């Protein structure tokens, strides 16, 4: 099963190369890529930053984007055009990479979310971001992670049960697209989710 998932991941990465040829990056966006949000040199601990041109002097609301892919595949590049369009609407956007199952656990992925959030908390003001308006956006598996991360942020009980230290960054709203919310192990993705865990029990 693990080999099958790794093959799907490899096929996805190849499809992204072809996809890149079909789309043109929107004009009017300042784009910086592969910024490390942790000091461990893990290639998964990187993010991209998007800011609209012509608004360098303005303080902008902040979006942190968490890509989808069923927790097993995907990358920040897949949401490149989506994030650029969000930026053109007047947002400072950070699009983060995170470790993928089965190379890590679901709770490791949440730790990555909080590492990226701490990075944003530390750097957003210098990047022209408004920390009083921070939004967490995710699709599919990214929406699932964003939901659990937000629950942990707002409940010491859930954070303790998860064994995950939340970020000090306050999130003011979630933007969830086609969220993946599995609570059983009756599908191939669910095989890698905890069969029974206090955090899941609290939220289901």
Residue ranges and their predicted role:
Residues 1-204:
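Alpha/beta-hydrolase superfamily serine-hydrolase fold, recognizing
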């Amino acid at each position: 099963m693990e080999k099958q998932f790794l093959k799907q991941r490899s096929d996805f990465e190849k499809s992204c190369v072809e996809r890149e040829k079909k789309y043109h990056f929107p004009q009017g966006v300042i784009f910086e890529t592969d910024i490390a949000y942790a000091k461990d040199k893990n290639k998964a601990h990187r993010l991209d930053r998007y800011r609209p041109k012509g608004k360098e002097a303005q303080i902008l609301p902040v979006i942190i984007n968490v890509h989808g892919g069923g927790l097993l595949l995907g990358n920040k590049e897949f949401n490149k055009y989506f994030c650029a369009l969000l930026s053109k609407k007047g947002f400072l956007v950070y699009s983060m990479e995170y470790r993928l199952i089965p190379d890590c656990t679901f709770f490791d992925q949440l730790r990555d979310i909080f590492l990226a959030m701490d990075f944003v908390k530390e750097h957003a003001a210098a990047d022209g971001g408004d920390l009083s308006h921070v939004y967490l956006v995710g699709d599919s598996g990214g929406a699932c992670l964003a939901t659990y991360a937000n629950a942990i942020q707002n409940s010491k009980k859930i954070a303790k049960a998860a064994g995950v230290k939340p970020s000090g960054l306050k999130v003011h709203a979630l933007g969830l697209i086609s969220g993946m919310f599995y609570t059983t192990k009756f599908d191939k993705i669910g095989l890698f989710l905890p069969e029974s865990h206090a955090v899941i029990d609290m939220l289901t």
